[in-house]
Amino acid sequence: MPKTLTEKLNAIKAAGKGIFVPYIMAGDHEKGLDGLAETIHFLEDLGVSAIEVGIPFSDPVADGPVIEEAGLRSLAHGTSTQALVETLKTIETEIPLVIMTYFNPLFQYGVENFVKDLADTAVKGLIIPDLPHEHANFVEPFLANTDIALIPLVSLTTGIERQKELIEGAEGFIYAVAINGVTGKSGNYRADLDKHLAQLHQVADIPVLTGFGVSSQADLERFNAVSDGVIVGSKIVKALHQGEPIQDFIKQAVAYQK
């Protein structure tokens, strides 16, 4: 596997394919965290580009009802940040993992300890949706000599100069937030969304992935056309929990040719 998340995603981009990153909630499995490796390998076998792994939190301000409920199920299974870290140490995969966590669980664990404990795992990225750009210095110094990238989230309502500020020096990929509000609100897009995505894509020197509300074949086609790929969360989480078939959707996403 390429050493960094950026290298992995750039290789997919160079091959003329769309990047596809599914989101899963750690511990949202009938086996709790004991089922995490099974889910990761299921997605890996389908050819996904990377996997976003959520840490459950009791006050998930950016999450819609599907992911919020998944977090509550995970917490009910006894998932903790410490237990997740220990589980990740045991999982062997060629797919880079990206941790999505609110700052509170990270703060409680200790940012430096968290980064050190993940050093020899497949984790190559970190998303903290409630960490303002101005406070990135709480985390970035601990990532400086690692292969873990701090992923910026960029709202498409943000002006171009602010976008440039948010993505300056970023690694991994840029998470373009397609909707205003929480995850899972499919189809609630701005009329000028494509224009703003294209604008962000022009000023970025790493892959731009679109997320929040992406759930249909039409969404895959639309956002692959104006960005480098997509992140899908609620649709994946719901299907895995309810035992619904999701393989065909993932295969279509993975096979998308630019």
Curated annotation (Swiss-Prot):
Pathway: Amino-acid biosynthesis; L-tryptophan biosynthesis; L-tryptophan from chorismate: step 5/5
GO CC annotation terms, alphabetical: cytosol
EC number(s) recorded for this UniProt protein: 4.2.1.20
Signal peptide: none
Highest taxon in the source lineage: Bacteria
InterPro entries the record matches: Aldolase_TIM, RibuloseP-bd_barrel, Trp_synthase_alpha_AS, Trp_synthase_suA
Protein family according to the UniProt entry: Belongs to the TrpA family.
Protein name (record): Tryptophan synthase alpha chain
Source species taxonomy: Bacteria, Bacillati, Bacillota, Bacilli, Lactobacillales
